[in-house]
Structure formats: C-alpha cells, structure tokens
C-alpha cells in the first residue's frame, strides 16, 4: 500500500515539475502527424527513384536529407516546382547544397622545437 502511495506522490511531483505524460503523448502524436503529412507531400513531389535515393541519404546523413526535404517542400509550396523531382534533379539539388555547406578545413603546422640536450 505504501509503495502505491509513493508512486502516486512521485507522479504528482513529476507533473508539478513539468512532466506531464499526457502532454508528451499529445506532442508525440502531433510530431507523428506532421511527419506523415511531410511524407505524403514528398510522395507526391518525388519520383520513385528520387524517393529511394533520398531514403538512402537519410540512413547515412539524416540532417542533409532533412535539408533537402525542406528545400523541396518549400519549393513545391511556393509554386517553384512545375513537375515532379526526378533522380537527376535531386542529384543537382544535392550538389547545390553541398557547395553551400562546404566546410572550411584549417591545417595547422606546428614547429618542432630542437632540444640541445
């Protein structure tokens, strides 16, 4: 009996601290719904080959895939896309994104100190 009381007490403390399981479930449901809408839009915009390529990119680099998806969806919503995005066009978009996000590398050459000992 006391363990049930302790559990209830801990649960009420967590809710008081901002931990609300129902709110988390609602947020998760909203995220899931938004993801389903996003996938539905991509299915309409991308050809099967382009979708397959994008799914392989998602496995390796999810952040790059997300950037490309955002770019494609934004272009479709603003009316910039007049036809479906095929594999060649997706490759072109990937190259453009790679050029924009190239990382600068800095090579440091350290001087060696000659010790007379």
From Swiss-Prot:
Coiled coil: none
Family (UniProt): Belongs to the PDCD5 family.
InterPro entries: PDCD5-like, PDCD5-like_sf
Biased composition (Low complexity): 8-22
Bias type Basic and acidic residues, positions: 23-39
Pfam family, one: dsDNA_bind
Protein name per the record: DNA-binding protein DDB_G0278111
Organism: Dictyostelium discoideum
